[in-house]
């Protein structure tokens, strides 16, 4: 029996609150059950040095966890003087996922940075970050259209992400922390709205998984992501 009696292909309750903070061009609080992430998108009228003169924009991301997002206090990375490898890996994943749905040429020579700050962690923080960041980015792009900076929104669609895994011999979708910490196989899947893959990160924590189990997990991820995309569309329509 899963936590909260969820079916194996059922995601947690998803809540997307737009315009959550005052100043960011796009601001979203996303909740995957008890996992809560604040995603703020900022537009800057410049690009990184390697893109100067290329007539295109850039989308990047930063990721962090508040000290008491977890069961016990985690020291701020700023206090340590450097980012951890996990943090850098996750923020690069978020940025790659977002760029998959943006026409960077249409964005022009400007940069959008999406800051994803985990307020509370109960598994799936990177997948919640990607899903919420997409909505925040969409809102930021719409503001560029509304103020006349851009003629059309340069986003080509929506992107979302979900965790899947094998827990107690069963393939399940959208793992909570308790499930994640006991998973025999743990996988994060990123897809665009039509089901095409952006990234798959999968690891066997114990017993290796079979090719058939991989296909089962990818199918489960597609079912979960379709639920997330529907939640994104519903939020953007409000």
Swiss-Prot record:
It is an enzyme of class 2 (transferase). Its EC number is 2.7.7.56. It catalyses: tRNA(n+1) + phosphate = tRNA(n) + a ribonucleoside 5'-diphosphate. GO terms for molecular function: 3'-5'-RNA exonuclease activity; tRNA binding; tRNA nucleotidyltransferase activity. One of its GO terms (biological process) is rRNA catabolic process. The keyword Transmembrane does not apply. Keywords: Nucleotidyltransferase, RNA-binding, rRNA processing, Transferase, tRNA processing, tRNA-binding. The keyword Metal-binding does not apply. Pfam families: RNase_PH, RNase_PH_C. Belongs to the RNase PH family. Homohexameric ring arranged as a trimer of dimers. This is Ribonuclease PH. It comes from Mannheimia haemolytica.
């Amino acid at each position: 029996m899963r936590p909260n009696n969820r079916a194996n292909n059922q995601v947690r309750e998803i809540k997307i609150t737009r315009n959550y903070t005052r100043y960011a061009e796009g601001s979203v609080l996303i909740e995957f059950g008890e996992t809560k992430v604040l995603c703020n998108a900022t537009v800057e009228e410049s690009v990184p040095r390697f893109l100067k003169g290329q007539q295109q924009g850039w989308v990047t991301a930063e990721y962090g966890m508040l000290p008491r997002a977890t069961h016990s206090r985690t020291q701020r990375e700023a206090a340590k003087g450097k980012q951890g490898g996990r943090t850098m890996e996750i923020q690069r994943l978020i940025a790659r996922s977002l760029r998959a749905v943006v026409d960077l040429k249409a964005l022009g020579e400007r940069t959008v940075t999406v800051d994803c700050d985990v307020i509370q962690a109960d598994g799936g923080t990177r997948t919640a970050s990607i899903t919420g960041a997409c909505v925040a980015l969409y809102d930021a792009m719409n503001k560029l259209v509304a103020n006349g900076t851009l003629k059309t929104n340069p986003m080509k669609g929506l992107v979302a992400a979900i965790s899947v895994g094998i827990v107690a011999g069963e393939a399940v979708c959208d793992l909570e922390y308790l499930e994640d910490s006991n998973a025999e196989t743990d996988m994060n899947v990123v897809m665009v709205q039509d089901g095409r893959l952006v990234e798959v990160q999968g690891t066997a924590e114990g017993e290796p998984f079979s090719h058939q189990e991989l296909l089962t997990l990818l199918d489960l991820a597609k079912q979960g992501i379709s639920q997330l995309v529907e939640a994104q569309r519903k939020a953007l329509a409000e």
